[in-house]
A protein has these predicted regions:
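A glycine-/small-polar-enriched, mobile loop at the entrance of the PLP active site in fold-type I
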Residues: 3-24
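Short loop-beta-helix segment that forms the pyridoxal 5′-phosphate
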Residues: 14-21, 29-53
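Active-site phosphate-binding strand-loop segment of PLP-dependent enzymes
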Residues: 87, 91-144
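Catalytic P-loop NTPase motifs of RecA-like helicase/translocase cores
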Residues: 121, 150-151
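Conserved PLP-anchoring active-site segment centered on the Schiff-base-forming lysine
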Residues: 54-73
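Short, structured coil segments at secondary-structure junctions
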Residues: 37, 61, 81-83, 138, ...
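Active-site PLP attachment segment
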Residues: 162-191
Length: 191
């Protein structure tokens, strides 16, 4: 931290868009990608805005976003910003999710399933292995919001994939925040 402050100063003074890309940004993204066992990571200004941005822009017209009914407000906001159709499935009910997909998957070019790793209000853990099976069977993308599971679940705090023993690419997108277990600010999307 002292070395970074001496080299870059103690403030970015602005967002990356205004302040410019610095080598330390990519170093952070590479470190998160290695931790989350993904190809790459992008760091954004905050966890809430990361969900809104990704959920709101990953899918478009002719696509479907299907999300857990108890998902965080930022996920709901992202679905409202997207041109894709969206619909919730009952909380942690993978049978209901599969029923929905069976009835309509062929109507959409791309389908994004969104759930949280750990739900902040009640501590429920998502049935991630079953979500992975469903996304593979129906040709969907899977995004897990790890704001409350990264640094908490798993032997070393690696999150849901470590907790459930999943391969690094079983979850297409792992969203997380830097403001909880990592004690700073920002959000990331690893995939």
């Amino acid at each position: 931290a002292q070395e970074a402050a001496a080299h870059y100063g103690c403030s970015a003074s602005a967002s990356r868009l205004l302040g410019g890309e610095k080598p330390i940004h990519k170093k952070l993204e590479n470190a998160i990608a290695a931790w989350k066992h993904t190809e790459d990571t992008v760091v954004l200004v905050g966890g809430h805005s990361t969900n809104v941005t990704i959920v709101g822009n990953f899918c478009g017209k002719g696509d479907l976003i299907i999300y857990d009914a108890l998902a965080h407000n930022s996920i709901h906001e992202g679905t409202r910003l997207s041109d894709a159709e969206s619909r919730p499935f009952p909380h942690n009910d993978t049978a209901a999710l599969e029923t929905i997909l069976r009835s309509c998957r062929d109507k959409y070019a791309k389908v994004l399933i969104v759930a949280e790793g750990v739900y902040s209000m009640d501590g429920d853990i998502a049935p991630v292995p079953e979500l992975v099976r469903i996304k593979k069977e129906y040709g969907c993308f899977l995004m897990i919001d790890e704001a409350h599971s990264a640094c908490v679940l798993g032997r070393t705090g690696g999150g849901v994939d470590e907790y459930f023993g999943l391969a690094g690419d079983d979850i297409d997108m792992k969203m997380g925040t830097l403001s909880k277990g990592l004690g700073t600010c920002g959000g990331y999307l690893a995939g």
